[in-house]
């Protein structure tokens, strides 16, 4: 299985980089996982609705450029479906069973994802109704992917 995490914005925090590196190392025996960082669109502090839409659209074009036609796309969005770790593990297992070898998780910037990215997504996933920093979501997502592989293989970890 090839998993891509496509994310807007450059990760600056050392502690997040270390956590991400650790989970990428752990995941290497289960799947090929890559994190693709795309530049965020520079924008002033107080944007109008129209300006926010333009920023999301520009970031969306960058995201869509990284997704091939045969990729199953899962958008991380606050309005997405919430799943338990076991349900998430089951859904990853089902994707593999049905021959979906390329999966891309998409994490938008601080303004979220464009309409076009949401249309391209096969499903939408939410980790919480709370707003979380998009940089932190990379680490949380990698941990949950790792947990899912451990659950699916019946290996200890997730309790």
From Swiss-Prot:
Disulfide bonds: none annotated. S-adenosyl-L-methionine binds at residues 76, 108, 127-132. It catalyses: pseudouridine(1915) in 23S rRNA + S-adenosyl-L-methionine = N(3)-methylpseudouridine(1915) in 23S rRNA + S-adenosyl-L-homocysteine + H(+). Its main location: cytoplasm. Its EC number is 2.1.1.177. It holds the Pfam family SPOUT_MTase. Keywords: Cytoplasm, Methyltransferase, rRNA processing, S-adenosyl-L-methionine, Transferase. It is an enzyme of class 2 (transferase). Belongs to the RNA methyltransferase RlmH family. Specifically methylates the pseudouridine at position 1915 (m3Psi1915) in 23S rRNA. Homodimer. This is Ribosomal RNA large subunit methyltransferase H. The lineage of its organism: Bacteria, Bacillati, Bacillota, Bacilli, Bacillales.
